Regions:
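C-terminal lobe and pocket-closing loops
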Residues: 209-277, 306-309
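Bacterial N-terminal signal peptides that target proteins for export
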Residues: 1-11
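N-terminal signal peptide c-region/cleavage motif recognized by signal peptidases
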Residues: 19-23
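Hinge/capping helix and adjacent helix->loop/strand transition within the periplasmic-binding protein
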Residues: 84-90, 104-189, 238-240, 251-284
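N-terminal (or domain-start) structured segment
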Residues: 25-115, 152-154, 163-164, 176-201, ...
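Short beta-strand and adjacent tight-turn residues that come in two discontinuous sequence segments
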Residues: 92-94, 122, 184, 203-205, ...
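An extracytoplasmic/periplasmic, membrane-proximal ligand-sensing/linker region
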Residues: 31-33, 174, 262-322
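A ligand-binding cleft/hinge motif common to bilobed small-molecule-binding domains
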Residues: 97-108, 165, 169-174, 201-235, ...
Length: 322
């Protein structure tokens, strides 16, 4: 009797332990505020797209989505902050240069581009353009190339970091022209300088050029993207202008940390696709100078790899100054 009671007690204790130790069902994501780190200043196309999606995603996620701008140094401080968080509730919303370009220009990075940044979903393709001062009185890229060839080393150019910089440097190489690069810590003065003729050419997002284009101060000659910009439909693509090798995309997208579970990545991508289906979002993104490009994590990863290979090929022939 005593033995049977002791046995029953032991079984009861063991059963209680098993129930207590059993893993609980995973909690639905997100459980708290989601942080979105952007490596650019407020108001530029990438930032505006990130903020638009952050605002819209707060509804299905039923949690606040807070955007933090950490600009400068080619996105390195922003990426470092993102990586150190090691958190499923922290996303990076960025241009692809932090993966495709930074490894080419920095001998050592405080993050591993391939391991620490996991593509979750692309959001938009921001149009990248080459524009010149209206004072040059050129009407096409061919006209500009002929002018630059006739004045080697006498014309100036500037470009915002990332793909615009590499794209313009590749144009110089492809066209066989020599120009002087002017570097700006903050690119906004460059827009004013090209509008007033102090520099002759710039490469940057189409969205930030539109006001100067509409004012007649600058002439947009080409977009690097595979398709024409809806805001400047008369402007040819790189391929149409005779430089297919200069085709680049200005992808903006969400990245997660390297151990982010697959189901969370899939959830973020699916919710982003739902946001992109709203006609008001389509219209707003177009007004920024971009087009929506929202797919799956695998599609985003493939697009990043394709762009990385193209940038590496360009980098073998040029050495632009950051």
């Amino acid at each position: 009797m005593i033995q049977r009671s002791a046995y029953a007690l032991a079984v009861g204790i063991l059963g209680a332990f098993v129930v207590w130790a059993a893993p609980s069902k995973a909690e639905p994501w997100p459980q708290r505020t989601v942080r979105v780190i952007v490596p650019l200043p407020p108001g530029v196309p990438t930032d505006l797209v990130c903020r638009l999606f952050a605002e819209r995603l707060s509804e299905p996620w039923r949690q606040p989505v807070a955007v933090e701008n950490r600009q400068g140094a080619d996105g390195i401080p922003a990426v470092s902050g993102f990586v150190s968080a090691r958190d499923d509730h922290t996303l990076l919303c960025s241009f692809p240069g932090v993966i495709t370009i930074n490894p080419l220009i920095y001998e050592k990075l405080p993050y591993d581009p391939r391991r620490d940044l996991v593509p979750v979903v692309s959001l938009s393709d921001n149009f990248i353009g080459i524009a010149v001062s209206a004072a040059l009185k050129v009407n096409s890229l061919d006209d500009f190339v002929k002018l630059a060839r006739s004045q080697p080393g006498k014309l100036n150019w500037a470009a915002s970091p990332g793909n615009p910089l590499y794209g313009f440097a590749a144009l110089l190489k492809s066209a066989g022209i020599e120009m002087v690069q002017v570097s700006y810590r903050d690119f906004r003065p460059a827009l004013q300088d090209v509008g007033e003729g102090r520099i002759q050419a710039v490469a940057t997002g189409v969205g930030v050029l539109l006001a100067q284009v509409q004012a007649g101060k600058v002439k947009l000659l080409m977009v690097h993207n595979p398709q024409r910009s809806p805001q400047a439909p008369e402007v040819p693509t790189a391929t149409e202008a005779g430089y297919p090798e200069l085709t680049l995309e200005g992808l903006t997208g969400f990245y997660g940390w390297r151990d982010m579970p697959a189901d969370i990545k899939a959830r973020i991508a699916a919710d982003a696709r739902a946001v992109a289906a709203d006609p008001a979002v389509v219209e707003r993104v177009a007004s920024i100078g971009s087009v929506l490009r929202v797919g799956t994590p695998a599609e985003f990863a493939a697009a990043i790899e394709e762009q990385r290979a193209k940038i590496v090929a360009i980098a073998r022939t040029i050495k632009p100054t950051q």
